[in-house]
Amino acid sequence: MSNISSIVNRARDAFNSGKTRPLQFRVEQLEALQRMINENLKGISKALASNLRKNEWTSYYEEVAHVLDEIDFTIKGLSDWAEDEPVAKTRQTQEDDLYIHSEPLGVVLVIGAWNYPFNLTIQPMVGAIAAGNAVVLKPSEVSDHMADLLSTLIPQYMDKDLYPVIKGGVPETTELLKEKFDHIMYTGSTAVGKIVMAAAAKHLTPVTLELGGKSPCYVDKDCDLDVACRRIAWGKFMNSGQTCVAPDYILCDPSIQNEIVEKLKKSLKDFYGEDAKQSHDYGRIINDRHFQRVINLIDSKKVAHGGTWDQPSRYIAPTILVDVDPQSPVMQEEIFGPVMPIVCVRSLDEAIKFINQREKPLALYVFSNNDKVIKKMIAETSSGGVTANDVIVHITVPTLPFGGVGNSGMGAYHGKKSFETFSHRRSCLVRSLRNEEANKARYPPSPAKMPRH
């Protein structure tokens, strides 16, 4: 454990040396990261297969491609983002230079998540490097194969002092959080997010928390249900439901509930065949603890599809629950598994009320052909982000910041927003020593009369 302090101190010394200040150095490190990924795609895929049973294609599409896109976008935009930003002048500052200067924060701690253990560890790192910080990486110990891989690869390609990787579980993370960082980025549960924030408060360290919650999916009667259900099924059951922005539950009018069930079932058959257990595209629950938690949420009396599982392989069949009571256990926590409850509401207003009576979610989804329905849902609810007539895809766009609100998190990242998150925007005014006559009015003694505006 004593080694953790020395690793963090070494990262701070490396940062204080000033070598991250030049943009060229940052670009070189991002290019090294890019090279690391491209030269080790097989190893990344193998680690993801070992932990989550992802195949080569889903590993690339769900995790790697987004990181490579982020690196490309960041390298192309960095010189513009880092330029001093002029601001409007007041009457008294017409002769001055006024601008905002972006400077690195210092040493950033990134605590990754187990469900997308490559993407959610490396993508935040991209923005932190671009902003000129040292970055201490703490991959999730739950996805142990990926943690092992990252701790091996990153020192081979990148500056060893600036970008150390620390492996371990709760004891190591607890020790890490005792250290003073200049920013902490955490992705994971709300419960642990509160622990991270409490630890950060002791050092007045700012945090970005990407948490989660129960992301609702409202399906309007005025909707192409074939398309809607295909997109919903894709987003819900990818990675076996272990996605922080997966649609957690469906809200719909009771008159279309059965039709939604049938169309979801058709999509599941199209995606995974008659038996999802045999599909190479269908994942597994990460460990026994999470497996037990998810199956405990399945009420057999409400099962319209699925509801079966295999404990040795941690397989849970894609499951649909109907006529779900809002007070039932499956509606009290983020499911984070392949179980889709359907709750019936009789109007858009009732759906909005239902959503607003609960904690603010990380994402919200609405399917409708009626723009007024979509605009009303957006205007009268709150969530980290919204996708209308699809799911999840808003987080793949680098020009849209990704983050939560309320219980689903704070702060945001992706694209330019990542650069801003990991930078201090420093207000600067540069004035000449000439023209002192114009400043005389501010000096004592005060005039007898107040000036008129």
UniProtKB/Swiss-Prot annotation:
Residues with N-acetylserine modification: 2
Share an example GO biological-process annotation for this protein. lipid metabolic process
User: PROSITE patterns from the xrefs?
Assistant: ALDEHYDE_DEHYDR_CYS, ALDEHYDE_DEHYDR_GLU
Record-annotated active site = 210, 244
- Give compartment(s): Cytoplasm
Q: Which reactions is this enzyme annotated as catalysing?
A: an aldehyde + NAD(+) + H2O = a carboxylate + NADH + 2 H(+); octanal + NAD(+) + H2O = octanoate + NADH + 2 H(+)
Lineage, top-rank taxon, reads Eukaryota
Which key words are in the record?
Acetylation, Cytoplasm, Lipid metabolism, NAD, NADP, Oxidoreductase
Q: Is Acetylation among the key words of this record?
A: yes
Q: What class of enzyme is it?
A: oxidoreductase
Keyword Cytoplasm applies: yes
Modification N6-acetyllysine, positions: 178, 194
- What's the chief localization of this chain? cytoplasm
Q: What is its EC number?
A: 1.2.1.5
What's an example of a GO molecular-function annotation for this chain? Answer: aldehyde dehydrogenase (NAD+) activity
Q: Where does NAD(+) bind?
A: 188-193
Please describe the quaternary structure of this protein: Homodimer.
General function of this protein = ALDHs play a major role in the detoxification of alcohol-derived acetaldehyde. They are involved in the metabolism of corticosteroids, biogenic amines, neurotransmitters, and lipid peroxidation. Oxidizes medium and long chain aldehydes into non-toxic fatty acids. Preferentially oxidizes aromatic aldehyde substrates. Comprises about 50 percent of corneal epithelial soluble proteins. May play a role in preventing corneal damage caused by ultraviolet light.
Protein name, entry field: Aldehyde dehydrogenase, dimeric NADP-preferring
Question: What gene is this protein a product of?
Answer: Aldh3a1
